[in-house]
Amino acid sequence: ELVFVNDGSKDHTWEKILELKEERAHIKGVCFSRNFGKEGAVFAGIAQAEGDCIAVMDCDLQHPPETLIKMYRLWEDGYQVIEGVKASRGRESFIHKMFAKTFYSIISDATGIDMSRASDFKLMDRQAAEEFLKLPERNVFFRALSSWVGFKTTYVEFDVQEREAGESK
């Protein structure tokens, strides 16, 4: 099953998702009326997913799909949350890297969770996903909250790939 979330995109993303849904029964789509942000899109995708495990990844292919195989095998070994951690930040500007380092240092100090190489690229067991969805918070930081829920966790390094299309908003 694949769940695609269109977070208010102004290009033809939703039309493409609808085409894919017509061609393949295992594809689902969620379309937001406007851009609600990445966290809302992640919540919506997890809520729609029905599998025994759920992977969250960016559709711009900066999260390498081939890493999902390693994540899945770790899930089969009994891990409930498999965190994708950045081996490198890819080709970001110096100023972007500096601000990111400062931001994640503050978040790490506040939460007690090492966020220095964290990403939204994860695979979660159904149980972990259900507990995540039960949390009352709706203004969340998925990258940190998924580590906080307290399930058996491991990490997989990946190299951030060049963006295939689009840009961060």
What are these regions (language model features)?
Residues 1-9, 30-31:
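Short beta-strand/loop segment that forms part of the nucleotide-sugar
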Residues 6-15, 61-62:
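A conserved acidic beta->alpha catalytic loop
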Residues 23-26, 152:
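Glycine-centered tight turns that cap/initiate beta-strands
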Residues 60-61, 160:
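Short glycine-rich anion-binding loops that position phosphate/pyrophosphate groups of nucleotides
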Residues 135, 149-160:
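Structured inter-helical modules in multipass membrane proteins
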Residues 19, 26-34, 38-48, 53, ...:
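Acceptor/aglycone-binding surface of glycosyltransferases and processive sugar-polymer synthases
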